[in-house]
Amino acid sequence: MSVEKMTKVEESFQKAMGLKKTVDRWRNSHTHCLWQMALGQRRNPYATLRMQDTMVQELALAKKQLLMVRQAALHQLFEKEHQQYQQELNQMGKAFYVERF
């Protein structure tokens, strides 16, 4: 074998070894990642439940707040329409009967 062929074979061997090391590192990190995920799932079930409970409470409060905002907007709309209706009746010379106590 010539020196050039030996250097080419040696270079390809070095590339193959580098690729093998990269694959081994990836495999080890993947295994470690899976292990960490499983460990985290086993370690924190109560934290997950607390977060879910907190999310449920926040959603309930958000729904209640949205309901209150919508009710206030509807009340304002009814008041505005009532005022407009009163103005139209006043222009025609009519009025609502308002009982005073």
UniProtKB/Swiss-Prot annotation:
It comes from the Eukaryota. Keywords: Cell projection, Cilium, Cytoplasm, Cytoskeleton, Flagellum. InterPro entries: CFAP141 (IPR029375). One of its GO terms (biological process) is flagellated sperm motility. It holds the Pfam family CFAP141. It is found in: Cytoplasm, Cytoskeleton, Cilium axoneme; Cytoplasm, Cytoskeleton, Flagellum axoneme. Expressed in airway epithelial cells. GO terms for cellular component: axonemal A tubule inner sheath; axonemal microtubule; sperm flagellum. The keyword Cytoplasm applies. Microtubule inner protein (MIP) part of the dynein-decorated doublet microtubules (DMTs) in cilia axoneme, which is required for motile cilia beating. PANTHER family: C1ORF189, CILIA- AND FLAGELLA-ASSOCIATED PROTEIN 141. Microtubule inner protein component of sperm flagellar doublet microtubules. This is Cilia- and flagella-associated protein 141. It comes from Homo sapiens (Human). The lineage of its organism: Eukaryota, Metazoa, Chordata, Craniata, Vertebrata. The gene is CFAP141.
